[in-house]
Amino acid sequence: MVAVPTAWCSVALALLLALQEGKGQVAAAPDHPAPSPRARGSHLRPRRCSCSSWLDKECVYFCHLDIIWVNTPGQTAPYGLGNPPRRRRRSLPKRCECSSSGDPACATFCHRRPWAEAVVVPGSRSPADVFQAGQRWTSAGELLQQLREISATKIRFARQHQEAEREPRPMYPRRRKT
C-alpha cells in the first residue's frame, strides 16, 4: 500500500519540475526561433522592436509581445520589462527600431511621423513647418494670426454643433402599452 502514494508523489513531482522548466517560454514559431540554452538564463523576451523611450507607452505596448499591462488609477504600468533605469541609454532618431526588416507593420509604426507633425493647423504653412523643433516666430503678429485662426475654427465648429442640436427631430407617436 505504501508504494501507490509514493508513485503518485513521484509522478506529481516530475510533472511540477517539467512545468517549472517550461514556465515563461514561448513556443518556437517560424518568426521567433527557439532561444539557445545560454539565452534562457538571461530570460530574453520576444519583442518586435526596441523603443527609444520607456515613456512612450504606445511604443512599449506595440514592441514588447509578452508584457502584462495593469491598470492603475494614475497610469498604465507595464510589468515584465525589467528595471528601466538599468537599460542602456540610446539616442535613436526614430521612435523605435524593428528587429526584423521584413515586418511591414513594425516599419510603418516605427517610422511614421509623430502626432504633432501630423496635426493639421489652419493656415498657409504645412504642419511640418509649424511644429519643427527650435523654430521661432518671425514676428508676434504671425503667432497672433495663427492663434486667431485656431480660435475662429473652434468657434465655427461650436456653432455647427449648436445648429445640429437645434434642428427639430422627427417626432414619432409613442407606442401605447396594451
UniProtKB/Swiss-Prot annotation:
Q: Where is this region: Endothelin-like?
A: 96-111
Swiss-Prot/TrEMBL keywords: Cleavage on pair of basic residues, Disulfide bond, Secreted, Signal, Vasoactive, Vasoconstrictor
Q: Any keyword Signal?
A: yes
Compositional bias of type Basic and acidic residues: which residue ranges?
Answer: 160-169
Where, subcellularly, is it found?
Answer: Secreted
Renumbered to this chain, region (Disordered) spans 158-178
Q: Which Pfam families match?
A: Endothelin (PF00322)
Looking at the keywords, is Protein transport present?
Answer: no
Q: Which residues form the signal peptide?
A: 1-24
* Record's GO cellular component terms: extracellular space
Identify its protein family: Belongs to the endothelin/sarafotoxin family.
Please describe what this protein does: Endothelins are endothelium-derived vasoconstrictor peptides.
Q: What is this protein called?
A: Endothelin-2
What species does this protein belong to? Mustela putorius furo
